[in-house]
Amino acid sequence: MARLLIVHHTPSPSMQALFEAVVAGATHPDIEGVEVVRRAALAATATDVLEADGYLLGTPANLGSMSGALKHFFDTIYYPCLDETRGRPFGYWIHGNSDISGTERQLLAITTGLAWAKAAESVTATGDPDRKTLEACTELGGTLAATLMA
């Protein structure tokens, strides 16, 4: 069975709502043969990454940067996972109250360094999430999970 790892930092109600929408898409009844594993960024390990076939990453934009929790996750897994996870599919969502472009640049720089393959349209949002944003997150989760279906 394929495994999708969702690594997230959800300190706010907005991030929690987006996370729940991503999970709803990834665990949709039409998705078969994919185990969805959820880990808070500070709890996710290199073993989690190595055992997964694809990744979804969620972070708030804090003062123009990704959350310290997600950065810590990347710092922890980078070298142990660098060679073993090349080419694996990933997607991401970012939420902030203002500019999120720095956060996206950081996340893409790290995932490029890992040689992960972006496999779904990212979701970036500012302000309170609306229905369109939540639907985009559901689509993100479903798309990544469907990518892993055998």
What are these regions (language model features)?
Residues 2-29:
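N-terminal beta1-alpha1 ligand-phosphate binding loop
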Residues 18, 69, 103, 133-136:
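Residues at alpha-helix caps and immediate loop-helix transition turns in enzyme cores, especially N-
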Residues 26-33, 82-84:
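Short helix-capping segments at alpha-helix termini
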